[in-house]
Amino acid sequence: MVNVNNFKNGITFQEEDEIFSVIEAQHSKQGRGQASVKAKVKNLRTGAITIKSYTGGDKVKKAHIEKIEMNFLYDEGENIVLMDNATYEQISIPKTRVEWEMNFLVEGAKVHIRKFADEILDIEIPVNIELKVIDAPEAVKGNTSSNPQKKVKVETGFELETPLFIKEGEIIIVSSETGKYMGKGNNK
């Protein structure tokens, strides 16, 4: 059991036959009243993010999540195929569970799958990912007022705003949490 007073980012727990991961927890106590905890949580089965409220001292059942490192192999229509680095076993995961992550997955990318018992919940990808720009329009002269940006397309098909100096063929770093440009990558 996990005391809700100890909630912090990344803690996983079970409630109402669902598995949740804490994204953010806010603890508050008012005067003589009892403490309360508001937690922003992600349902690991559906991907839905909700806010749950608890009375200080409540307990929830801990969910023991296993993480396994795998490589992304390919997209097979309705599913993606991953391979276990240790056993070379291949598994398929429905794309509906990894819709956002698909924007950043390139062949051979290292990911972690999260398993509960024998059920695969979702995948975790690195926070910052290097991707190659495949389409970048030329910068327009005179378009240089406050923080000029242009829309580029990366190798996964994802489109994002970048500074004007980014050119086709360059490697850029993209945040997998926000989908925003973070900087130039290692252009070899």
Swiss-Prot record:
Give the protein name, as stated in the record.
Answer: Elongation factor P
Name the family the entry cites: Belongs to the elongation factor P family.
Superkingdom assignment: Bacteria
- What organism is the protein native to? Mycoplasma mobile (strain ATCC 43663 / 163K / NCTC 11711) (Mesomycoplasma mobile)
Q: Which UniProt keywords apply?
A: Cytoplasm, Elongation factor, Protein biosynthesis
Q: Where is it located?
A: Cytoplasm
NCBIfam families registered for this protein in UniProt = efp (TIGR00038), PRK00529.1 (NF001810)
Q: Which SMART domains match?
A: EFP (SM01185), Elong-fact-P_C (SM00841)
In terms of CDD domains, this protein maps to: S1_EF-P_repeat_1, S1_EF-P_repeat_2
Main subcellular location:
cytoplasm
Annotated GO molecular function terms are:
translation elongation factor activity
**Do you know which Gene3D superfamilies this protein is assigned to?**
2.30.30.30, Nucleic acid-binding proteins (2.40.50.140)
User: Which pathway does the protein contribute to?
Assistant: Protein biosynthesis; polypeptide chain elongation
Q: Which GO terms describe its cellular component?
A: cytoplasm
Q: Report the record's Gene Ontology biological process terms.
A: peptide biosynthetic process
Q: What does this protein do?
A: Involved in peptide bond synthesis. Stimulates efficient translation and peptide-bond synthesis on native or reconstituted 70S ribosomes in vitro. Probably functions indirectly by altering the affinity of the ribosome for aminoacyl-tRNA, thus increasing their reactivity as acceptors for peptidyl transferase.
